[in-house]
């Protein structure tokens, strides 16, 4: 389990650096919803928009490509946890929000990073 956490943190570090270069600002990392028991990897802003980011990091030999691991169930959990985040932080449901994903496929020879700005389209 510790190895999975280390790998997850590495993926989040890579994603955070990538998004900051694109002009995003970190608000919170690893928000855990008590009610939903979900987790949001990165909560960021760009302008006035709060962006909830799911990070998927896959190394060579692991279970398929990163993009294949964002299921409808995961999207639903992300949305519900974002609602919980807004409530916990006292923010309005009128707050502009979006949901993105950073997909990282890492091999010994190459690292591919993709950013999906809206995973619900």
Curated annotation (Swiss-Prot):
GO MF assignments: nucleic acid binding
InterPro entries from the UniProt entry: Restrct_endonuc-II-like, tRNA_endonuc-like_dom_sf, UPF0102_YraN-like
CDD domains to which the protein is assigned, alphabetical: PoNe_Nuclease
NCBIfam families per record: PRK12497.1-3 (NF009150), YraN family protein (TIGR00252)
Family stated for the protein in its record: Belongs to the UPF0102 family.
Protein name as catalogued: UPF0102 protein BHWA1_02005
């Amino acid at each position: 389990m510790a190895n999975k956490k280390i790998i997850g943190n590495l993926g989040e570090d890579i994603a955070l650096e990538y998004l900051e270069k694109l002009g995003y600002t970190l608000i919170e990392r690893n928000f855990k919803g008590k009610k939903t028991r979900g987790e949001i990897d990165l909560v960021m802003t760009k302008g006035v928009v709060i962006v909830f980011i799911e990070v998927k990091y896959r190394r060579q030999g692991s279970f398929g490509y990163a993009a294949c691991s964002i299921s409808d169930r995961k999207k639903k959990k992300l949305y519900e946890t974002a609602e919980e985040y807004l409530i916990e932080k006292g923010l309005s449901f009128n707050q502009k929000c979006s949901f993105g994903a950073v997909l990282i496929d890492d091999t010994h020879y190459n690292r591919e990073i993709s950013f999906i700005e809206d995973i619900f389209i």
